[in-house]
Amino acid sequence: MAGHSKWANIQHRKGAQDAKRGKLFTKLIREITVASRTGGPDPGNNPRLRTAIDKALVANMSKDTIERAIKKGSGAADGDNYEEVRYEGYGPGGIAVLVDCLTDNRNRTVAEVRHAFSKAGGNLGTDGSVAYLFSKTGVVSFSADLGEDRVMEPALDAGADDVVVNEDGSVDVLTAPDQFEAVRDALEAAGLTPESAEVTMRASTSVKLDKEDAEKMIRLLERLEDLDDVQNVYSNADISEDILAELG
């Protein structure tokens, strides 16, 4: 799978840093608010909201805070009017990067994203410059402890497109976006608890990076993730577990 497990590791490291800076909750609340506004306040009928709530619960956000964010998005409370914006660019070694933002000020956001790219040796591209390298994909991820054999049959029976074992032994179940909910629910009903489950942007091909470019790439990803308006960053970078461990 094109860089998914490696990026999951980078995200995990970054997630810990974000939590310390108080940024993670801000981003989760913003996502819950927008998901509620665009798809309604019932997570049973709003897959995006359910995913956002699941992430918030994993991050130990209180149910009261989650409920306030849902009400804010559904119009039961006053709130900022955020819009979704996607930027495309290039990282070190020509790595393709997608940056999804929720912003109340496009001018501020594009300036900050452009600055992050330039400071890390990349550059902001034009619309369509790299988006064609990614496809919207449901990904239900399981730990290495569970193993491929436990996951494979129920996943394929539920309508998954593929089951991929990553370098670290973790298992990713890939689905079409419109099958994501059904597959996730079927796996949970079979007693399999995912580490994460979301509809994401998956690169069709990946680019292996050496240590030097990997270090630059991680710096770019961290600069982008540090921005308040940035919700998700996707790339087609393939960074080996060994290099990630070295860069620690």
Curated annotation (Swiss-Prot):
Annotated Pfam families: TACO1_YebC_N (PF20772), Transcrip_reg (PF01709)
Keyword line: Cytoplasm, DNA-binding, Transcription, Transcription regulation
Keyword hit for Transcription regulation: yes
One cellular component term from this protein's GO annotations in UniProt: cytosol
GO molecular function, one term: DNA binding
Cell location: Cytoplasm
Single Gene Ontology BP annotation: regulation of DNA-templated transcription
Main location: cytoplasm
Family listed: Belongs to the TACO1 family.
HAMAP family: Transcrip_reg_TACO1
Protein known as: Probable transcriptional regulatory protein MCA1220
